[in-house]
């Protein structure tokens, strides 16, 4: 597996290689910090992950399978199209309530925050939506000690600048029999 060869895969085992906007290649890292490992290369491209074994994360949040797809003959992962909404309010609470106006988010989606004024501590964070209604979402971010929200900001499902996209998976070792 991607988790130490025999461990259960997690969404954070291996950093994905960007191919194009929203498209990533699965790789197995060897060595440390980009140096060659025992295989002689810093990573190996994985073309055929075991179907049903792939998990994907953005930052430190595992994202639901409905928000990405994998081609098990190429090892390419495609993230769903970005969904973004302007923020009009954020509560100070153990689970932040974010006011957006009409939106298309649902429970389980992962959203990142940027460009918020006042409550700047939330910028760059990512949380899972735990509940929603027509104009708000509740995320698993404790904002109770943050500054008061004043204005602006947006939420996005796509990775924010600086966020790592990672995955875990099982794969078969290539073997040749003579």
Segments and roles (model prediction):
Residues 2-73, 78-83, 106, 170-178:
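Extended beta-strand solenoid/passenger and fiber regions
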